[in-house]
Structure formats: structure tokens, C-alpha cells
Amino acid sequence: MRYALGIEYDGKNYCGWQRQNNVITVQEKLEKALSKIADEKIEVVCAGRTDTGVNATNQVIHFDTEKKRKDTAWTLGVNTHLPSDVAVAWVKKVDDDFHARFSATARNYRYIIYNKPLRSAILSHGISHCHFALDENLMQQGADYLLGKHDFTSFRTVHCQSHSAVRTIKHCRVTRQGDYLVVDIKANAFLHHMVRNVVGSLMRVGQSQETPHWMKEVLLAKNRCVAGVTAPPEGLYFVDVDYPENFELPKSRLGPLFL
């Protein structure tokens, strides 16, 4: 039997999603909790691996098991074995042809910037802070140059292992909600650090250090050195995954928080 789960987590205390030796990861914690409920070793596959410090409000995973359990065992039961910063949000039994990664048609991230001169004590993590005033309209103009299918070499880390840097951005929206700027970006897939490098570059535009057209110049350069700095991980959230409708997976509120 194959199950899909919706997972949310605060990435502050984890060295990313993927299981690794000698460090704490989200995948490790989830597999241990699932294995206790199933009373057998469980391995999971996720829709998109997140880096150290990155959060998720709707990561999607799948796993296989021959053990029959009530749905509440895979939600409430698993949550009792998870730390407070990782939680199962929903469960659905799926056909064997469902694959959390390969069945996905798009991934959606949101980056949250607290844009005030002084930092917040209450929201000391889970957001990024920029004390310089940011113009969301200029940032949106710059973001529009990224829409469509392009080579995003300029926006990936030099350590990116993907064979191709070509990706298709379906939307990239910059909006302000009070003191918060939200960069909402959806693509068929993302390169290593791609979202954070895009945001770091857009922040230069938002501060009028560069014109919106500069984003197109960076894109065409295909050179990581010409783009902006990598934005911090704590403001980044994996918020949604698109799948073909026939899988009928639950849809959660994108979030995070009140957004």
C-alpha cells in the first residue's frame, strides 16, 4: 500500500530535509516516527528537498507499507512521535503509480521579508529582515523578466548538481502586506538555492541599487557572480505542490502564518 502525507515543519533546527550522517534532518525524524507506527522500517520520498533552515507548510511525501493502520494512526499517531517543529497535516491512500517527486508538475515557494528599520523580537525566526525600504512595484517589474522557460544558471549555486539549468517559472509575484513583503514563486522545478538567489537579486532592485531590467541582464549572463547575494534561509517556505487532479490530494492553505 502507498500513502501520501502532507508535512509541515520549522526548519530552524534541521540540516535540511534529506537524511544525512551525523546531522539532524526532517526526513530522519519523520521516518523514525512512521517506523514506530508501522512497526517496520519506513523510507519516504518527498516532493522537493529543502536546505538547512528552510521551512515547509505543505511538503508532500509518499511511503509504502504492508501494515494496515487507521488514517488517524498516520496523522495523530505519527505526530505523537515527532518533535514539536514537525507535524503531519493530512494523509491519503494513493495508487502505486503516485510518486511524490516524479508525479509533481510544479512546486511553489514563498519568501517572507519583514521590512522595517528595526528587527522584531517576537518574530525572531521564520522570516527574513531587511531594514532598507523595499519597493515592491520595482521588484515585481524585475520578477516579470523571469517568467517562462529560461536557463537559470545565474541563480543557482556553484554546487548545484542538476544536469540542466533550464526551468520554467509559472509565476513570480511580489506583494506587500503591511510590514511584510511576500515573494511567491512557482516553477516546474527549482535549482539549488534558486529561490533565495532570485530573492536576493530582487532585493537589490527593491532598494534601487539596480533597475528592474537588470534582472534580465543577470538571467542572460548565465553567471552566478553577476546576481545578488543569496537571501537567508529562514524566510523561505515550501508551500505547495501541483499534481494531476486524478490523484485527488488534499489542498492546504498556503501560509505561512496569516499570509
UniProtKB/Swiss-Prot annotation:
Subunit description: Homodimer.
Protein's job: Formation of pseudouridine at positions 38, 39 and 40 in the anticodon stem and loop of transfer RNAs.
Any GO molecular function: tRNA pseudouridine(38-40) synthase activity
Cross-referenced InterPro entries: PsdUridine_synth_cat_dom_sf, PsdUridine_synth_TruA, PsdUridine_synth_TruA_a/b_dom, PsdUridine_synth_TruA_C, TruA/RsuA/RluB/E/F_N
Family named by the database record: Belongs to the tRNA pseudouridine synthase TruA family.
NCBIfam families (alphabetical): hisT_truA
Record field: catalytic activity: uridine(38/39/40) in tRNA = pseudouridine(38/39/40) in tRNA
Species in which this protein is naturally found: Colwellia psychrerythraea (strain 34H / ATCC BAA-681)
Amino acids binding substrate: 109
Record-listed E.C. numbers: 5.4.99.12
Keywords: Isomerase, tRNA processing
Keyword Isomerase: yes
Protein name: tRNA pseudouridine synthase A
Biological processes annotated in GO: tRNA pseudouridine synthesis
Annotated Pfam families: PseudoU_synth_1
Residues forming the catalytic site: 51 (nucleophile)
